[in-house]
Every structure is written in C-alpha cells, then in structure tokens.
C-alpha cells in the first residue's frame, strides 16, 4: 500500500512556493509542518489565510471545522499586512496548543495569501 496524505510529510518549502498545500494524493501538513510553515511566513511575502483541519481516526479523515481558519475576504484585504500576519500567527499558535491536547492526530491543508506589491 502506498503512502496516504494522512501519513504527513508535506514539503513545507514547496507549499510556501506554491501558495497552498496539495490536494490528494499530496500529504497533509502535520502540526510541526504547520509550525514550520508559519515560521517560514515570518518576514516573507505570504501568510496562511485558510486552514482545513482533519482528525485522523482509524481509517477516517474527519473534518474539524472548529480547528480551521477561514479568512481572506474583502475585509481582510484592506487591513495592513503586519496586522494580518500578527493575527494569523496568534491564531495558529493557539490552534497548535489546542491540537496538542487532542487524542487523535490532527492534520492540515492550507492556503496562503501573497502580499500585494507596493
């Protein structure tokens, strides 16, 4: 049997460069991958704007909307970049703390937003 997305192991640099994690059969991001991607976004020209979280329970990948981030609307786009980055960073750090308390593994798919050229 081949490797499944739930096995993790996303290439964080490729995710950053592409602006999103892949779709099936690309691997999900693990919590550590998400932390590494967040670190990569600091000082860069992208930020994480959307996160889909999945609880891995046996053979099922259960969507966890309560652990997701859904941003990127017009109201987001008019805010200063540093404000958006700080808010996203705070959210993801809190999210990772919550995920650490979960019984089953939590994995992620993400989308990034690129800073508009000045």
Residue positions per predicted region:
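Generic preference for hydrophobic/aromatic residues in regular secondary structure cores
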Residues: 1, 48-51, 55, 108-110, ...
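Long, contiguous N-terminal structural blocks used for assembly/anchoring
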Residues: 1-31, 40
